[in-house]
C-alpha cells in the first residue's frame, strides 16, 4: 500500500493523507488517535479498514464536513455498515456509497434523536424491486439499532436499500425514486379504476412492478416491442377497462420520462392489469 502522509485528522477513525501526490481518506478504528499533520503511516503500523480516493474537490469537502459533525461512535457504526455492505455478494461501488450513506445515516440519526421521522411512501415498491438490497439494508438497520441503542423505523430500511441499489444498478437515486413514484401512482390508478385494493404481497403485484421497471428501462434505451394487429384488437375488445387503465399509466410514464409509447406497450401492460381483474373476479 505504500506510505501515507497525514494532512488532516478528522476524528479518531478517519484521517486524510497523501499517497504518491494523491489525496486519500483512510478509515479504521482508532486510526486517527494522536495522529498529527505530517506523520507518516503505513499498513504495518496501523490497521486500515478502507481507503477511499474521492475524485472531486466537492466530494472531498462534503465528506470531510460530514465526518467533522459526526460523533466517533456514530461514524464507527457507519464504517462497520459500509464494510458489511462491501463484503456482501452485491457488486457495490463503495467509493460512491461512502458519501451518500454517511450523509444519510448521520442526518437520519440526528432526526431520530429529535423525534423527526421522515416517512417513506415507497417501502413496498423498494422491497419488491430491489429485494437483495432491501435484505442487506434491513441487516444494516438492525446493526445500527443495536450499536446506537435506537429504533430506526422500517422507512429507513427502504431509504438505505435505495442507496445500496443505486450503486449496483444503472440508475441514479433520483431515477429510482421516480420509478417508485410512477409504480405507486400506477397502483393508485388501478385501484381506482378496478374499485379494489391491490394486495402488495401478491404475485400479480410483483409481476406488475417488475414489468413497469423493465418497461421504463427498455423505453429509455429505445428498445420497443411489437404485437400483431389482430392480437392488439382482441385485447382491446376483451379488456376495455384494463386497456383504458394501462393507457392512463403509460401516458403518465411518457410525460415523466419523455419516452415514446407504442400500442403494443399498452397491450402488454393491459394483460398485467387484467391479472388484478381476474383476482377480483375469483374472490
UniProtKB/Swiss-Prot annotation:
Signal sequence annotation: none
Origin superkingdom: Bacteria
GO BP terms, alphabetized: positive regulation of DNA-templated transcription
InterPro entries from the UniProt entry: BglG_antiterminators (IPR050661), CAT_RNA-bd_dom (IPR004341), CAT_RNA-bd_dom_sf (IPR036650), PRD (IPR011608), PRD_sf (IPR036634), Transcrpt_antitermin_CS (IPR001550)
Pfam families, A to Z: CAT_RBD, PRD
SUPFAM superfamilies: PTS-regulatory domain, PRD, SacY-like RNA-binding domain
GO function term, MF aspect, one: RNA binding
Domain PRD: 69-173, 174-283
NCBIfam families, per the entry: antiterm_GlcT
Similarity-based family: Belongs to the transcriptional antiterminator BglG family. GlcT subfamily.
Name of this protein: Protein GlcT
Gene (UniProt): glcT
Amino acid at each position: 500500500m505504500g506510505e501515507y502522509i497525514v494532512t488532516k485528522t478528522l476524528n479518531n477513525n478517519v484521517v486524510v493523507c497523501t499517497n504518491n501526490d494523491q489525496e486519500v481518506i483512510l478509515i479504521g478504528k482508532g486510526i486517527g488517535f494522536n495522529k498529527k499533520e505530517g506523520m507518516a503511516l503505513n499498513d504495518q503500523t496501523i490497521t486500515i479498514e478502507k481507503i477511499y480516493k474521492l475524485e472531486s474537490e466537492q466530494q472531498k469537502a462534503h465528506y470531510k464536513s460530514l465526518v467533522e459533525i459526526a460523533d466517533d461512535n456514530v461514524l464507527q457504526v457507519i464504517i462497520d455498515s459500509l464494510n458489511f455492505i462491501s463484503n456482501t455478494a452485491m457488486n457495490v461501488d463503495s467509493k460512491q456509497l461512502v458519501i451518500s450513506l454517511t450523509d444519510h445515516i448521520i442526518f437520519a440519526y440526528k432526526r431520530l434523536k429529535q423525534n423527526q421521522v421522515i416517512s417513506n411512501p415507497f417501502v413496498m415498491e423498494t422491497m419488491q424491486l430491489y429485494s437483495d438490497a432491501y435484505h442487506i439494508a434491513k441487516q444494516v438497520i438492525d446493526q445500527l439499532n443495536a450499536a446506537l441503542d435506537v429504533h430506526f423505523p422500517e422507512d429507513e430500511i427502504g431509504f438505505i436499500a435505495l442507496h445500496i441499489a443505486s450503486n449496483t444498478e444503472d440508475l441514479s437515486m433520483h431515477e429510482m425514486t421516480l420509478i417508485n413514484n410512477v409504480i405507486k401512482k400506477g397502483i393508485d390508478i388501478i385501484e381506482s379504476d378496478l374499485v379494489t385494493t391491490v394486495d402488495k404481497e401478491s404475485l400479480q403485484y410483483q409481476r406488475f412492478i417488475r414489468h413497469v421497471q423493465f418497461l421504463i428501462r427498455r423505453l429509455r434505451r429505445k428498445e420497443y416491442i411489437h404485437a400483431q394487429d389482430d392480437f392488439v384488437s382482441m385485447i382491446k375488445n376483451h379488456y376495455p377497462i384494463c386497456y383504458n387503465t394501462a393507457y392512463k399509466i403509460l401516458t403518465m410514464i411518457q410525460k415523466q420520462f419523455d419516452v415514446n409509447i407504442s400500442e403494443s406497450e399498452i397491450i402488454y401492460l393491459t394483460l398485467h392489469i387484467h391479472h388484478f381483474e381476474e383476482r377480483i373476479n375469483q374472490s
